[in-house]
């Protein structure tokens, strides 16, 4: 990925500077251990790491070159992984408590590391790179990328067929709301409109649907959009290649015909109806209904998270703060062991794929 530092030697051979060392430790264990009796096993190192951070910070925490303690656990089964994970978690708690640091443990996305679970240790800091949510009611805490939107099924009234209305010079949500209220006597706000954000994902067009009062958080989108290597917003050249997409007046109702994959915020529930683009210049449509007039290909957490949003556990309002990541722990599962052929013989003499964890300060 883009975080890797790549280089070549004088003979043209390709190398990279290690950002982390899951693969190397997996291969090392593969060459040294072969039985369930050798596990559980944890190995650590303290070594310089290199990452081409998009926004390197001054100081010692988030630079492109930094010293990191990384450790790796190896277990026969998931129950063993859970034990190893919790031991490392408690060791980190003991370490940070002994140092007197203020920190929060938050749910996080595993990202390119893979795996089923990860948590970050975040030290609150107004200039920190990470943003997280915290519920003072139940203690729920999560990186904004991992924040879950909890919504109820739509209970509103059914509406009639789509109506296409003249809305000249309304390419923005604010201008659209103004015209609807003044020209058509409506009583709407931005939350009643549907925003269609067009992007190119690995050079294929996609649309992300969010309520009109929200923005798409590209960092959240990238974290939750699995398997996509390159993501960028639509540019004028992309509209030129897709002439049926009218800039400022795009709606989801023709997405399938246009070859667009539809991703939607969980708030775009089945049966909800919206005011959105009519796919015609200077025209918008109302009563565009999810499930009837368009089908969502995949729901995704991509809308911006705000202070005051409901906690997914207790539904009380959350607060938002910034922080510096000082530790990150992962349950990697069998991703690396499967890829690199790390197995051990179990009690019956049968080979089983080892399950792994990764832990870094």
Regions found by a protein language model. Name each.
Residues 22-29, 55-71, 76-361:
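Extended, low-hydrophobicity, polar/charged segments
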Residues 1-53, 199-200, 267-271, 335:
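Active-site loop/lid in soluble adenylation, ligation, and acyl-transfer enzymes
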């Amino acid at each position: 990925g883009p975080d890797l530092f790549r280089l070549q030697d004088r003979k043209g051979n390709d190398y990279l500077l290690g950002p982390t060392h899951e693969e190397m430790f997996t291969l090392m264990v593969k060459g040294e251990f072969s039985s369930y009796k050798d596990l559980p096993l944890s190995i650590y190192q303290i070594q310089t790491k290199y990452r081409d951070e998009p926004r390197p910070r001054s100081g010692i925490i988030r630079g492109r070159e930094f010293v990191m303690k990384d450790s790796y656990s190896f277990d026969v089964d998931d129950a063993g992984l859970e034990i190893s994970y919790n031991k490392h978690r408690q060791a980190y708690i003991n370490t940070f408590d002994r140092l007197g640091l203020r920190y929060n443990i938050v749910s996080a996305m595993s990202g390119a590391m893979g795996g089923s679970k990860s948590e970050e240790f975040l030290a609150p800091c107004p200039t920190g790179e990470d943003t997280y949510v915290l519920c003072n009611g139940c203690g729920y805490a999560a990186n904004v990328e991992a924040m879950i939107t909890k919504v109820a099924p739509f209970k509103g009234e059914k509406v009639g067929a789509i109506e296409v209305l003249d809305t000249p010079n309304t390419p923005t949500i604010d201008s659209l709301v103004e015209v609807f209220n003044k020209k058509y006597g409506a009583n709407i706000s931005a939350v009643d409109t549907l925003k269609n954000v067009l992007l190119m994902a690995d050079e294929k067009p996609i649309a992300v649907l969010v309520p009109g009062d929200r923005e798409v958080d590209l960092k959240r989108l990238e974290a939750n959009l699995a398997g996509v290597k390159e993501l960028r917003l639509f540019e004028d050249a992309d509209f030129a290649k897709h002439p049926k997409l009218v800039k400022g007046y795009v709606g989801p109702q023709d997405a399938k015909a246009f070859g667009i994959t539809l991703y939607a915020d969980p708030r775009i529930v089945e049966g909800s109806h919206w005011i959105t683009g009519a796919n015609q210049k200077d025209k918008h449509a109302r009563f565009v209904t999810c499930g009837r007039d368009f089908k969502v290909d995949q729901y995704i957490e991509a809308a911006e998270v705000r202070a005051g949003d409901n906690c997914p556990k207790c539904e009380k309002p959350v607060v938002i703060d910034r922080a510096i990541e000082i530790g990150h722990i992962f349950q990697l599962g069998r991703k690396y062991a499967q890829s690199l052929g790390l197995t051990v013989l179990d009690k019956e003499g049968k080979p089983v794929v080892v399950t792994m964890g990764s832990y870094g300060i």
